[in-house]
Amino acid sequence: MTKSELVELIASKQTQLSVKDVELAVKSIIEHMSQSLADGQRIEIRGFGSFSLHHRAARTGRNPKTGDAVQLPAKFVPHFKPGKELREQVNDSMKKGF
């Protein structure tokens, strides 16, 4: 699902809100979450999951075109850990689908 599909879905279910209002809300939530992660904060949404930063150590990689070794620097990457309710909901719906 893309951001625009999410906006359309929410707007269709919340008829009192315009598409523009929903779009602004979704955009604002994403911006605030991104900024919180950039500031090194952990985000926890109970029943959904948590977002945190994980450290990736420097390593030697390979250029896929040339095969040459390339040094990749250490970095922090966003990590999502689904909450128990989300895991159970996804697992239950996948069991029904198979």
From Swiss-Prot:
Alphabetized UniProt keyword annotations: DNA recombination, DNA-binding, Transcription, Transcription regulation, Translation regulation
Assembly with partners or alone: Heterodimer of an alpha and a beta chain.
Family designation: Belongs to the bacterial histone-like protein family.
NCBIfam families tied to this protein: hip, PRK00199.1
Gene: ihfB
A biological-process GO annotation: regulation of translation
Protein name from the UniProt record: Integration host factor subunit beta
One of the record's GO molecular function terms: structural constituent of chromatin
